[in-house]
Design a protein with these regions (language model features):
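Class I SAM-dependent methyltransferase Rossmann-like catalytic core
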Residues: 1-28
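Glycine-rich SAM-binding Motif I of class I
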Residues: 45-49
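Class I SAM-dependent methyltransferase SAM/SAH-binding core
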Residues: 51-92
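A short acidic, Gly/Pro-enriched loop at the edge of an enzyme's catalytic core
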Residues: 103-113
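A short SAM/SAH-binding and catalytic strip from SAM-dependent methyltransferases
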Residues: 111-125
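A short glycine-rich, Lys/Arg-flanked "PGG" loop and its adjoining helix->strand segment in the class I
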Residues: 127-140
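Conserved beta-strand signature within the Rossmann-like core of class I S-adenosyl-L-methionine
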Residues: 141-149
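Class I S-adenosyl-L-methionine
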Residues: 164-198
Length: 198
């Protein structure tokens, strides 16, 4: 089944993600003039509209930046989201490695770093670097948000972040997570968690 931006399952997943992220972030994200979010390993950035909506509920303006190593997906994201967002939100997408954030001056100091379906157990060394550099780039009061497909992978990622000094301040087990059949125990945004810098 193709996962296009118009796929009905994808739209349901994004609606659920919006609800869960709002509940997760609301206690930790005060209102302000501007918010900057960095979306790591973003692919096509399908969740960009949801993220922009949530940010502009808390801020007058918002800027979203997406990073991924896959140039074709980044091209799709730039083509779609530069024209689809409301006037108070802007977005740009860059082909770059998440474990080399220190080389990238363009991203500045985001308020939020977001990693949807983090893939910690695929390569613990790389993902440890991604987490570490994301935390390092955040604003002093910044938040790191992850979602996970699997129970065990989420536990491993949470443990790694805690060992880096991050403080978990919220988590949600998604009651409406859509089961995927390509791997046992896999489902969409099964776990969500938010961390602050230690």
């Amino acid at each position: 089944m193709s996962h296009t931006p118009f796929n009905r399952f994808l739209q349901q997943d994004l609606s659920t993600l919006e609800t869960n992220l709002r509940d997760l972030l609301d206690p930790h994200l005060p209102e302000r003039d501007h918010l900057h979010l960095l979306n790591l390993a973003c692919g096509r950035g399908d969740e960009t509209g949801v993220l922009a909506k949530l940010l502009t509920e808390k801020a007058t303006t918002a800027h979203l930046q997406g990073l991924d190593i896959r140039a074709a997906e980044i091209d799709q994201a730039n083509s779609r989201w530069k024209s689809e967002l409301a006037a108070e939100s802007t977005a740009d997408f860059i082909t770059h490695r998440g474990d080399r954030l220190r080389d990238l001056t363009e991203i500045g100091t985001p308020d939020i770093a977001f990693l949807r379906h983090q893939n910690f157990w695929n390569d613990r060394t790389i993902w440890t670097q991604i987490f570490d550099q994301a935390l390092d780039r955040l604003d002093r009061d910044g938040l790191l948000v992850i979602t996970s497909y699997f129970d065990r992978e989420h536990a491993l990622a949470t443990q790694a972040l805690t060992q880096m000094g991050a403080v978990q301040v919220g988590s949600i087990i998604n009651p409406n997570s859509r089961i995927l059949t390509d791997a046992p125990g896999k489902s969409v945004d099964k776990h969500l968690a938010v961390f602050k810098k230690g």
